[in-house]
Amino acid sequence: MISDSLNKILNRNNIPLDEVEKVVYEYILQSIFEDIVAYLLEDNNKENIMNNLRQFEDKEIVVNKLILDITGMKVNESELSTITKWVIAFIEKKSSRIKIKDKEKIKLLENQNYKCKLCKREIDLCNSEYDHIISWKLVGDELENNYQMLCKHCNRCKSSSILYRFIMLFKKY
């Protein structure tokens, strides 16, 4: 259920509610993850959690406790699975980037119909940049399907901000 005023502004501007809901949902999950990362970067927390993850076969138990303790949020199985993958990627992150080949960039461009994932402008190999959906500084190159092609403008504005996608949602309609 959304407020009448929000519904009216979305309708006036032809902004689909399902798009807003999707972006807000992804923002919430990424915010939970960023809170966990901030916690892991304090003191010896990362080392302690790494030890807990090694001890338990079901890593989701450890991550679920982290989520509850740090954010107070309750997540479903799918959300827990996603956040657990992100936490493990953060812990296993390597300090150097993997260089992506043009062939892989072209495949991403084809999957995106040669449009920037955020602003939907037409792009090609020359005027686009390879981007990590979940910031490289958080998960490195450890996650599959964490890549997208953006126009240079969106990639530079986005940086590691998870809010940029939300902002662009309103600018494209």
Model feature map: region roles:
Residues 1, 172-173:
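Short intrinsically disordered terminal tails
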Residues 1-85, 99:
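Mixed-charge, low-complexity interaction segments
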Residues 31, 103, 142:
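Short, well-structured alpha-helical interface segments that form or flank functional binding sites
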Residues 74-118:
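Short, charged surface segments at domain edges that flank catalytic/cofactor-binding sites
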Residues 111, 129-130, 153:
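Alpha-helical architecture
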Residues 115, 122, 136, 153-157:
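Cys/His-rich metal-chelating microdomains
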Residues 120-149, 162-164:
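Histidine-centered nuclease catalytic patch
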Residues 147-171:
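Short Cys/His-centered divalent metal-binding micro-motifs
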